[in-house]
Amino acid sequence: MQIFVKTLTGKTITLEVEGSDNIENVKAKIQDKEGIPPDQQRLIFAGKQLEDGRTLSDYNIQKESTLHLVLRLRGGMQIFVKTLTGKTITLEVEGSDNIENVKAKIQDKEGIPPDQQRLIFAGKQLEDGRTLSDYNIQKESTLHLVLRLRGGMQIFVKTLTGKTITLEVEGSDNIENVKAKIQDKEGIPPDQQRLIFAGKQLEDGRTLSDYNIQKESTLHLVLRLRGGMQIFVKTLTGKTITLEVEGSDNIENVKAKIQDKEGIPPDQQRLIFAGKQLEDGRTLSDYNIQKESTLHLVLRLRGGMQIFVKTLTGKTITLEVEGSDNIENVKAKIQDKEGIPPDQQRLIFAGKQLEDGRTLSDYNIQKESTLHLVLRLRGGMQIFVKTLTGKTITLEVEGSDNIENVKAKIQDKEGIPPDQQRLIFAGKQLEDGRTLSDYNIQKESTLHLVLRLRGGMQIFVKTLTGKTITLEVEGSDNIENVKAKIQDKEGIPPDQQRLIFAGKQLEDGRTLSDYNIQKESTLHLVLRLRGGN
């Protein structure tokens, strides 16, 4: 009988065989035709690798069956790489390949830059300079691929014993997150960790960026012995600050710690505990202040008042102002604190935008009022893009920007090529040539980003039972590939499948593009009963 052998290059070889031929004989015939030594051949049928000692009949290989030929590199092996989306990639590697080589192979297959790849095996992150053999990665091992979004980085944490821990972090991680990562690695509870950078103790609520901690910075980890304690300071706004103190700290020290956290000068602070105002020269122990006690902070303002400014990110800034301050002064104070130029600030109170020449009193802004700060782009606006991982990206855009421009901005921020991005707004996929205004996308609208695998698309296959299967395909896939994907999902052998589109039966050797099958097209699957035509 005749059988076909399909290579990874897409070439199909025809062989004359008997059902009683064993797999070694078949490999010898392939060697005669193609010159490929048997020990470099792996034959696959119905998803299974065929063993040399077995016969074609053992595997129920019949006339006109198609086997798949995969080359096994000398000393080489196959390993699998599983992504967070559940997709599994097969790679041909050598044990001597280093991790950089492996990342380059993944880039060839998937288009993901190596610097955005983190590979995990047996719970360990693999380092670029090491080889697969160093990690005892053997044939058919599975690695896990995690994407490191741009803005991710490594930092080091050095303990008093001299041990150095490596952590994967984002600049936006707060110190609590970092302590939790240290707990995961080392088992040290966060409340016993003190982290020091550039001589300063890092506070839980602040982020790495707040301290200008950049990639490959080294933090120092000091264990906090019980004997130090935490106390709380509650402000009139209801905000609670946590301080690390000793019973022997005097009240001046405590006010200095509050200044470090909140920027309030000690001479404007009054601290109250158990109804008493605390005096600078006395200690916490003098007042019997113990761990987890709560002090109350009252501000002593010179004819001034505090107001709050809330940003779109949810951050609240506290400003010291006078009712007679004009809006320009207020913007200048915000620039001092946050570095945002006044001409990019819009301040909103009670739904009204505040004008530079007017004063706070003109708008009846009183102590502890909250203003809202919106950034004004020159002629532009901010929109948000939410990814499937739940991350939200902020983009500066113009209504006249077309969707291609927006995808380019996302590539700048996240490194995702535009051809892998699908943007959805109000349930519609956005087309490259149209503008944001065409879709009535306005300031602070949220788009949703879905990743499209390279050149890939989804199609649907509907069975006679009414079940619909979703497949990830490329336009260049031939009908055999599609039937193999259906076999993977549903277990139906390709030779029992007939696929119909637009009333036509699809032929194995043709591609989806040949039939003008586009994304989200629906094919119909009809079963061909054995012994039938």
UniProtKB/Swiss-Prot annotation:
Assigned keywords, A-Z: Cytoplasm, Isopeptide bond, Nucleus, Repeat, Ubl conjugation
Covalent cross-link Glycyl lysine isopeptide (Lys-Gly) (interchain with G-Cter in ubiquitin) as placed by the record, residue numbers: K48
SUPFAM superfamilies: Ubiquitin-like
One biological process term in Gene Ontology: modification-dependent protein catabolic process
Cross-referenced SMART domains: UBQ
Domain Ubiquitin-like, chain residue ranges per copy: 1-76, 77-152, 153-228, 229-304, 305-380, 381-456, 457-532
GO MF term set: protein tag activity; ubiquitin protein ligase binding
Places the protein is found: Cytoplasm; Nucleus
Protein name: Polyubiquitin-F
Record lineage: Eukaryota, Amoebozoa, Evosea, Eumycetozoa, Dictyostelia
Gene that encodes it: ubqF
